[in-house]
Amino acid sequence: MIKACHERIRIHCHSLERLGTYLEFIGCNESAQRASGDIIRFFDIAVRHHFADEEQSLLPVLLEIGKKARVPLDKAMGALQSDHLELNQTWSGLRANLQKISTGQFMHLDFLEISHLNKKYHDCLIQEETRILPFAEHYLHRRQLDELRAAMIARRAIR
C-alpha cells in the first residue's frame, strides 16, 4: 500500500505542476477549479493517511525490529518525521491558494512553492524507498504485514 501511495503522490505532484502552468496559459476555468479540488482532496485525505500509516503503524514496528537487529534507525525515522512536518507546512501555503482556485477566486500558483513541495516529496520518497522500505521488506513477517495492512485499511474506513 505504501508504494502505491508513493506513486499516487508523484502523480498528484505532477498534476499540481500542470495546474500551475494551465492557470498561466488558460486561466481559472471549471477544469482548473475541478483539478484544484481533486488535488486538495488527495493531499488532505490520502497523504494525511499515508503519513499516519508510516508514523503510527510502520515506524514504531521498524524501530523495535531495528533495536533487536542492532540496526540504528532512530536518525532515519526522525528525519522522516521532520520531512513530514515540513511537507505539511509547505502544503498549507499552497492549499490556501488552491482552495481559492477551486471556487474561482484566485488565478495564480507560485511555481517556486510548487517546485519546493515537489522536490521535498521527491527527496522524501527516495529516502523511504531506498532506506526504510527495503529494511521493512527484509525484516517484516507475514503476520506483521497483515497487521500493518489492517491498520491502514481501518484508518481509511468511512466513519
Walk through the language-model features, giving the residues of each.
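Small-residue-biased structural context
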Residues: M1-R159
